[in-house]
């Protein structure tokens, strides 16, 4: 597992922040308080989940020496990265899942978790549909229907917008 990679601090932070919204403070599995990071051929894939909803994103690394995967607590890494201005971050992960994040003015030491404990996202099967929409089209549709949504904890189904793709 020993691995090392270099990635942009603000690029990584914005990707982590975008998918962190799915992480619930009342998770049934402690591993779901973490981001799953998987490095394959220079691409860092990041996953966040609450077991019902899974969000994933990816970012290109500047440099990487091997493939690997680990989980890291979302709050810990977000709090560490939000204070760092744009610069390259060097991540070093050893066999004990100790993560050293080096930056210009110092380093952070974090404890990772075994990625094998992270639940796999459900396979969508053969009847999944892939749709590409421009951001303005999607935002226009959301803005036109947002008025009809509720903020009711007792009826969570009313809190969202239903997409019917046929």
Task: Enumerate the language-model features and the residues they cover.
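Structural preference for solvent-exposed beta-strand-turn elements
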Residues: 1-166
